[in-house]
């Protein structure tokens, strides 16, 4: 039997034979369809199906504008501007006064650079002293009794001392405007009018001395105002009526100021026309009484509401 023997080539000597090319990647069409199918699902489904960690475990990035706490934080005193913000007006005043007393040069600088107090602010301070004085009166009993005087004596002295300190500030030459000086004196004199008349005569010396000092202050301002523009401010300011009212209310203790004003307006006396007499009951005007020196004599002057 004939046998056919074929020749075989060893495998390693064979030419490289590649198997048919197979596309291991899905076709573009299938890829598009797969992506579209994935897109149709909700994001929640994809997230739930994903094996990734939950959002709570993900580190969150802090906003960039937030400041990080200092790692070297330690206790320290407040900066001066922050400390001053926490002080009340009384605490600030006491602190500044204490510093100025220990360092006179600082006190002089404060006096020279501080704004000038206004009439309103000054009268408000005096009003606080007056309110403290009124609040110190005991309940019940007579307000003019010795017991009441002993209860309010300290507050009374503080009120009168504040008047003595503030009044020179509004007098010339420190205050050049006569209108400003007179306006302050008008308000300060009203405070003295409201002080009680005590049963014991010796207790009234505080009020008597206050009237004397206030009368001198009025006289100084009248004297200086008469030198400016011929005293025209005194003529048209109505101060003749106001000082006459104060003198009447004080029981004649402002007479020195009345006399000074009379002298300042004396240059007008010769040219002043006589008032028209509409009847025997008509009294002379206050200005005419001041010029003639007859104020308070005879019938009382009609000054109207003031």
UniProtKB/Swiss-Prot annotation:
One of its GO terms (biological process) is protein transport. Residues 36-47 have a biased composition (Basic and acidic residues). It is found in: Cytoplasm; Nucleus. One of its GO terms (molecular function) is proteasome binding. Disulfide bonds: none annotated. GO terms for cellular component: cytoplasm; nucleus. Keywords: Cytoplasm, Nucleus, Protein transport, Transport. Residues 16-30 have a biased composition (Polar residues). Residues 1-64 are annotated as: Disordered. Belongs to the cut8/STS1 family. Binds the proteasome. Involved in ubiquitin-mediated protein degradation. Regulatory factor in the ubiquitin/proteasome pathway that controls the turnover of proteasome substrates. Targets proteasomes to the nucleus and facilitates the degradation of nuclear proteins. This is Tethering factor for nuclear proteasome STS1. It comes from Phaeosphaeria nodorum (strain SN15 / ATCC MYA-4574 / FGSC 10173). The gene is STS1.
